Amino acid sequence: MAAKEVKFGSDARAKMLRGVDILADAVKVTLGPKGRNVVIEKSFGAPRITKDGVTVAKEIELSDKFENMGAQMVKEVAQKTADLAGDGTTTATVLAQAIVREGAKAIAAGMNPMDVKRGVDVAVQTVVDDIKSRSRKVTTNDEIAQVGTISANGEAEIGKMIAEAMQKVGNEGVITVEEAKALETELDVVEGMQFDRGYLSPYFVTNADKMVAELESPYILLFEKKLSGLQAMLPVLEAVVQSSRPLLIVAEDVEGEALATLVVNKLRGGLKVAAVKAPGFGDRRKAMLEDMAILTGGQVVSEDLGIKLENVSLEMLGQAKKVVITKDNTTIVDGAGSKEDIQARIVQIKAQIEETTSDYDREKLQERLAKLAGGVAVIRVGGATEVEVKERKDRVDDAMHATRAAVEEGIVAGGGVALLYATKALDKLTAVNEDQKFGIDIVRKALQAPVRQIAQNAGFDGSVIVGKLLEKGETNFGFNAQAGEYGDMFKFGVIDPTKVVRAALQDAASVAGLLITTEAMIGEKPEKKAPAGAPGGMGGMGDMDF
């Protein structure tokens, strides 16, 4: 086992604090509407430019291992806040740095670290309760757009686009962000259920110019096995022909004779038909077919359920207003399933999302939920150069997470104001002893840090602004750094999601509390490599053969 290097007490804390400061100082320049960019070197290609706190934090790795431990702990704060709320990572980093700094001073002055930490914990819980009590529900589309705009660094176009996407796909719908090849940023909304399987044969196409198959008010047959012959299907095919409506077949696969027969019938005009493979694999495929059945008001033809192809009637088939099939995707628009059944299925999938421990499964379940509940919106981010597109995509991602958080837990006054005024709630707290009281004071001081930093990044004096706001004492009164003026933050449209503010403080205090109570640090001792031996001299040439 390699030898270890151990540091104790103030030595350990000084090193750790240095690491915290390096990381936090790099991250906090990005805070606020006038925050600056950070340029990150990449091992290949152009450097990356970003204003996203967690992206900056992830890139920082220090050469001194003890300093690096401090930096990695604060990186954890940013990462945790990003995972939980999707935004607020820079605020969390600024708060963590402020709590650690003040905490280190308290410990150096001889206070009991555990009591100081208890004081911090009590204060944080009080502040969180206070912020929640002042939270307002998001009621209008404009408020959603404002939250998005603030998170996208004042770019109103992004805020509006996200609000529009959320309006179209609903709160359960999925909004994805992709890089576009064009200059413009655009929104593309797919209503209904879309899955990534296209037509099995180009002969199914109904619109040759666009190479798509469009079926108006079709019947939909959902079959979980492979279709290799059509003999068993003849009764249902005849019934569909009688009804003069098109048919979509979704099966594990349609091969050989079955596919050839369908294509021939389609070309002769006897039967308007298209066939696609079912999405997913294994159990997930079964679940997705079941989703489609509920959405379209049909049944999955499955031998597990005792249903055979020969016995299928028209009533067992699903129906939809329209189905559009391209070579890569199939979209079912306006399925005929009952609202109650769809709602029950949504509740069931939500329960599975709560229970699952796998991130991959959770992601897939959320996709299924979105397809059932509303649809999928894609924001394609454009720009003049690849660097610009990547920078903007970071901001759109942040804005999207922030708006989701706002819908979930409501909104509070932005610009660090909600945290600043929460200091009033701390006045009512009574501490058990002096050290705990100091812990409460640490949080009181730290809550001023975001407002100070936002003002500083905008070129104003943070202390003066904090003083003015506390003097005024109105909970929504703040400083709009973008315009350089004081006023009601809600009227300015400067608002933050409650969830983001809460998560930033809780995550910052959690890690900062651990750093304050650290008394020893253990790191690998670098092994000294033995110096390379001197090269041997030239040998004589006596043994050479000629």
From Swiss-Prot:
Enzyme class name: isomerase
Keywords of this entry: ATP-binding, Chaperone, Cytoplasm, Isomerase, Nucleotide-binding
Domain of life the protein comes from: Bacteria
Family annotation (InterPro entries): Chaperonin_Cpn60_CS, Cpn60/GroEL, Cpn60/GroEL/TCP-1, GroEL-like_apical_dom_sf, GROEL-like_equatorial_sf, TCP-1-like_intermed_sf
Record EC number: 5.6.1.7
UniProt catalytic activity: ATP + H2O + a folded polypeptide = ADP + phosphate + an unfolded polypeptide
Compositionally biased tracts (Gly residues): 534-546
Entry GO MF terms: ATP binding; ATP-dependent protein folding chaperone; isomerase activity; unfolded protein binding
Record localization: Cytoplasm
GO CC terms of this entry: cytoplasm
Presence of the UniProt keyword Chaperone in the record: yes
Subunit structure as annotated in this protein's UniProt entry: Forms a cylinder of 14 subunits composed of two heptameric rings stacked back-to-back. Interacts with the co-chaperonin GroES.
Protein name (database record): Chaperonin GroEL
Gene that encodes the chain: groEL
